[in-house]
């Protein structure tokens, strides 16, 4: 029986280093209200510390018995403690992960794959964000497991500064992306140059 359980819970053949585990979600995990600091973006008028990034994001969800967004949101609440990438680009990664998971998944074996490929405009507060010309290649696995459910996330994000026309990254304060950003504690503040945009503090 234990052998069968191991097969059902394994998403990949190779047994690599075990990713970090996240504790069980509380019963009230689905209660959520959009945080007031998230402002729908229109057109960014300020030029201060603003950069376009060509981003590729992929979130692969392994849930052999299915999965719920309640569980995904609970996993992402521990993102700051688990994140192993470049700290100067953690805000960018949170934006990309939230947008990717807001899209439609494509089934791939026992997994569901969410992908995002886009040019996005990011604006950071003074002395925040990546260095000029800095690129990102980030990959990490996170799992959540108890006696009734197993869910694994495999996150990949790549980003490089580019000069292609970018898009704003939050147009609806009630969108699922904003919900994930709230779960990941995305740190933003209202831009001093443009009241309709937010700048990243991370």
UniProtKB/Swiss-Prot annotation:
Membrane protein topology class: Peripheral membrane protein
Alphabetized InterPro entries for the sequence: Rhabdo_M (IPR006870), Rhabdovirus_M_sf (IPR038617)
Gene Ontology MF terms in the entry: structural constituent of virion
Gene3D superfamilies assigned: Rhabdovirus matrix protein M2
Subcellular location: Virion membrane; Host endomembrane system; Host cytoplasm
Motif PPXY motif: positions: 35-38
Chain positions covered by the region annotation Essential for glycoprotein binding: 115-151
Annotated site, Involved in the inhibition of stress granules formation and contributes therefore to virulence, chain positions: 95
UniProt signal peptide: none
Keywords: Host cytoplasm, Host membrane, Host-virus interaction, Membrane, Phosphoprotein, Viral budding, Viral budding via the host ESCRT complexes, Viral envelope protein, Viral matrix protein, Viral release from host cell, Virion
GO annotation terms (biological process): viral budding via host ESCRT complex
One Gene Ontology cellular component annotation held by this UniProt entry: viral envelope
Family: Belongs to the lyssavirus matrix protein family.
Domain notes: Late-budding domains (L domains) are short sequence motifs essential for viral particle budding. They recruit proteins of the host ESCRT machinery (Endosomal Sorting Complex Required for Transport) or ESCRT-associated proteins. Matrix protein contains one L domain: a PPXY motif which potentially interacts with the WW domain 3 of NEDD4 E3 ubiquitin ligase (Potential).
Task performed by this protein: Plays a major role in assembly, budding and uncoating of virion after membrane fusion. Completely covers the ribonucleoprotein coil and keep it in condensed bullet-shaped form. Inhibits viral transcription and stimulates replication. Plays a major role in early induction of TRAIL-mediated apoptosis in infected neurons. Inhibits the integrated stress response (ISR) in the infected cell by blocking the formation of stress granules.
Note: Most abundant protein in the virion.
Subunit text: Homomultimer. Interacts with nucleoprotein and with the cytoplasmic domain of glycoprotein. Interacts with host ATP6V1A; this interaction plays an important role in virion uncoating after viral entry.
Protein name per the record: Matrix protein
Species: Rabies virus (strain silver-haired bat-associated)
Gene name tied to this protein: M
């Amino acid at each position: 029986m234990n052998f069968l359980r191991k097969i059902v819970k394994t998403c990949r053949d190779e047994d690599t280093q075990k990713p970090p585990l996240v504790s069980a979600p509380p019963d009230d995990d689905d209660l959520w209200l959009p945080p007031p600091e998230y402002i729908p973006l229109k057109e960014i008028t300020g030029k201060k510390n603003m950069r376009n990034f060509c981003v590729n994001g992929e979130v692969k969800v392994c849930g052999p018995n299915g999965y719920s967004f309640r569980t995904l949101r609970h996993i992402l609440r521990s993102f700051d403690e688990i994140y192993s990438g470049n700290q100067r680009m953690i805000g960018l990664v949170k934006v990309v992960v939230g947008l990717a998971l807001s899209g439609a998944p494509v089934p791939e074996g026992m997994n569901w794959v969410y992908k995002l490929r886009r040019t996005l405009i990011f604006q950071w507060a003074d002395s925040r964000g990546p260095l000029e010309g800095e690129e990102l290649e980030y990959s990490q696995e996170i799992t959540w497991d108890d006696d009734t459910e197993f869910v694994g996330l495999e996150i990949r994000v790549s980003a490089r500064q580019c000069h292609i026309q970018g898009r704003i990254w939050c147009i609806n304060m009630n969108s699922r992306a904003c919900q994930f950003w709230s779960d990941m504690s995305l740190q933003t503040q209202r831009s001093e140059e443009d009241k309709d945009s937010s700048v990243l503090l991370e």
